[in-house]
Regions:
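Phosphate/pyrophosphate-binding betaalpha-module
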Residues: 126, 133-137, 141-167
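Short, positively charged patches
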Residues: 1-127
Length: 167
């Protein structure tokens, strides 16, 4: 997993290439390490950037351990299937809590400046749907995203937030 996290932080390759390497050319963590060693260690500039990425991965792993959150690589069976099919899914997800609630997602999309009606709609929706096995998903943006997330949490519903910048 540390190799995948290092690959996440390795900015010299586009995400498309990283995913191609992970899913088409390697079968295991050891295969990935061997592949990267062959490709990266032949170029001093890439080698320095790879070492920086490994250091960032180490720091992030320690931070996750201290703060109690987990790191889920795209190769994990727990990685949300729906997220794998978007054009550019993240190599890793950072989270706190359980990954089991990522099934049956419902996202509410709206403005960053909701009206009273919009906020009330979020409250009523959370009240009505919290009795069902639905996972309220948001990006925690200001406005409707945050409102539905907060209301769902107040009702004890399962929630998942995907943060663009990580934790």
């Amino acid at each position: 997993m540390n190799t995948l996290l290092s690959l996440h932080f390795f900015k010299k390759w586009p995400n498309r290439l990283k995913k191609e390497v992970v899913f088409k050319y390697v079968a295991s963590e050891n295969d990935l390490q061997a592949f990267l060693k062959r490709q990266i260690h032949q170029n001093d500039s890439l080698k320095r950037d790879w070492e920086d990425a490994q250091e960032k991965a180490h720091i992030e792993t320690e931070h996750a351990r201290r703060e109690g959150f987990s790191i889920l690589p795209i190769s994990s069976s727990k990685y949300p299937d729906g997220l794998k099919v978007v054009p550019d899914p993240p190599m890793v997800l950072f989270g706190r809590g359980t990954w089991s609630g990522v099934k049956s997602p419902l996202a509410v999309v709206g403005t960053r400046k909701p009206t009273g009606y919009g906020k009330d709609f979020c409250r009523r929706l959370a009240v009505e749907l919290s009795a069902y096995p639905i996972n309220f998903v948001s990006g925690l943006a200001l406005g409707i995203d945050a409102a539905i997330h907060r209301e769902a949490m107040d009702m004890g519903a399962t929630t998942t937030a995907f943060l663009a910048g990580g934790l």
